[in-house]
Amino acid sequence: MGLIALAVVAGVAALAYRMGYNRSRTELASLREEMEQMEAAGKDAAIVKRVSQQMEDIAYQQKAISDQQRDRAEEQSILATQNAYRAEMESRAAHEAELKAQSAAQVAERERANAERQQEIAVEQRDEATHAKNVADTLNRRTQARSLAVSSQVRREADEPEVADLLAYASWYFLKNNRGNQYYSETFKSLTQATDGILRYKMKEGGAVNALAKVPGRLGQCVAVSNFGEVERLTVNASQGGKRISSNALLFNSLFDFRDVLIKDNSIYALSLKGPLCVLDFEGNHVEVQLPEDNYFKLVPIGDGLLVAGRKSLSWYSDGKITGSEELPGTLSAIVEREGVTCLFFTDGGYAEMDVAGRIVEKAPLLKGVVTAAYYDKASKCLLLGVEDGTVYPVNQYDRVMETMAAHKAKCVDITMLGPVVVTGGYDKTAYIWNMDNLLFESGLSFREELQKEKVEKRVSGSQEVPTEWLVPVDYTFDGWALAVCGDEDGKSVWIGTSSGNVMLLNASADDMAQQLHNKLKRNLTQQEWIRYVGVSIPYMTFK
């Protein structure tokens, strides 16, 4: 029992041992596993610890770096603040400097503008001084030119032709080159004397020369008719010592009182106050065409025939006879053909126009007053009208009166035009010569410009413009009324007939006479002559 018990005990012990052994082994294994786990965990913990330590070190390093960066950032912030403050101060300083610069620039601009204005004022004053000097010099030369013209005539009377010629040319030269009027009477007359610019002839019977007509295609030839029934062909011929006018009497009949003459198709038509109309050739052969009763005064070329104008009627002439007549509604004072229209002026101041078919239409008068002389220039399309008080009016193609040309002191009775030169005759025993290119129009425009303008505005000349001298016409006074004026075929000379029976051929071109005179000059004025006649205010110059 005891053995059994011992056995049992041993068994139990063995079992217990086995059980404890097994349990211990299990626990050991578990412990070992735990230990392994713990070792692994320890290793991991060590690693973690090391990593943590490293991370902590890194963190400390990063913290140190962060602290350093923060410190630097703070330093940068402080520096930035300082820089911002400095920049603000510099900006303020720059703004103040800019304001000062702007202020200085404004001052400089004002000073520059003031300097420019002062310069402009100086330039204006200089220009004004120059202009004043130019005006003074111009006026001085114009005045001197007039004095030289008078001196020229005096020297010619004193039989000093060379000096007289030089003074006449100098007079024209100073006027021509200083916008003066080279048609100043004394200058023009001194040129005429120097160039034999006027020729004279006395009608054979001494009748009043009522009309003149140039001979087409013949220089220096015209036909003159008088109230004594004379019809003479006048010709300029060269002679010893110059030129003279010779005459060929084509007709003389004291019963005729010729009032007009016209040359057409190589025939001469001479119109008597009470008729007839005499038709002549250049040999003196003639036929007489009887006219209806009237006081006849003008011949007007119309188509292939003529219009014979009486004071109260019009008659048409063609193919050697009168083909028709018409009574007028009033008394004619003047008549002229203008671009296919016949202009009729009446003694009551009325005006009418007649077309090619003979229809007469009353129109508004072109101007106030009674028109007593009319001439139409086809080249310029200028209608020239002279009136009872002696005034002459140029009218352009638009029926606009361009200017008032105060001329004769009595009735203007005849007008002609050669290029820009207008010549008028009147009952004041004077013939006037105007150069329209020299005429100072109120509008400020030239004659050529005025001709093309339907309307004009008054224009004020610029301050820098030396004024053109007002044109005063050349006046030639005769011993009788200047009844007839007619341009010569040369386009420069004009025939003038007077009530005393004289006929003159006058060169109406100052420039042409000046050129002739220049060509004949033999020398220049000496220094002493220059000082004597011209003076010291105008520098010496030569003309030869």
What is the meaning of each model-derived region?
Residues A13-A211, P216-G217, N227-F228, A238-R244, ...:
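Eukaryotic protein-protein interaction scaffolds centered on beta-propeller repeats
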Residues E232-N237, L280, Y317, M354, ...:
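WD40-repeat beta-propellers
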Residues I198-M203, G242-F252, N285-L291, K321-E327, ...:
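A short beta-strand motif characteristic of beta-propeller blades
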